């Protein structure tokens, strides 16, 4: 949740949502991060028995897809709705503006997974 929140902070445009005129970035984080937590939690329950390396990459892809979805929704509500963006322009802007935050946060997320896997293996061997 922390990495997802960081990703949203890095991506989200400043300003308020045009839906209610008062929702800020923290509101967006509180809206999407519980969903991310549930996705990761369910994934870990379903794929826990699978110890194959592909499982963690699938998790990273799921999280990345969720972040892009959240970025699109928030971009649409905080920036595009105040202007005249087509759906294609929204998608292009979201992908372009998501590159750096998503790369930074996916790398951090991966390093967290790697750290906890190594720690778990070390604890088993001790």
Where are these predicted regions, by residue range?
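Alpha-helical transmembrane spans of integral membrane proteins, capturing the lipid-embedded, hydrophobic core
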Residues: 1, 32-37, 41, 61-65, ...
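Transmembrane alpha-helical segments of multi-pass membrane proteins
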Residues: 1, 52-73
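Alpha-helical transmembrane segments of multi-pass membrane proteins
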Residues: 2-11
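Alpha-helical membrane-associated segments of multi-pass integral membrane proteins
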Residues: 7, 80-121
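Hydrophobic alpha-helical segments of integral membrane proteins
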Residues: 8-9, 48, 69, 74, ...
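Interfacial non-cytosolic loop connecting adjacent transmembrane helices
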Residues: 10-31, 70-98
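Canonical alpha-helical transmembrane segments
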Residues: 31-55
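Low-complexity, intrinsically disordered extramembrane tails and loops of integral membrane proteins
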Residues: 122-126
């Amino acid at each position: 949740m922390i990495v997802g929140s960081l990703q949203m902070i890095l991506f989200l445009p400043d300003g308020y949502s045009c839906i209610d005129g008062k929702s800020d970035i923290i509101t967006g984080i509180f809206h999407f991060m519980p969903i991310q937590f549930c996705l990761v939690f369910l994934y870990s329950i379903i794929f826990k028995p699978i110890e194959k390396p592909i499982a963690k990459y699938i998790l990273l892809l799921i999280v990345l897809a969720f972040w892009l979805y959240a970025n699109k929704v928030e971009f649409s509500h905080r920036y595009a709705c105040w202007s005249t963006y087509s759906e294609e322009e929204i998608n292009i802007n979201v992908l372009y503006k998501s590159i750096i935050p998503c790369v930074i946060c996916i790398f951090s997320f991966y390093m967290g997974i790697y750290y906890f896997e190594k720690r778990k293996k070390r604890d088993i061997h001790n």
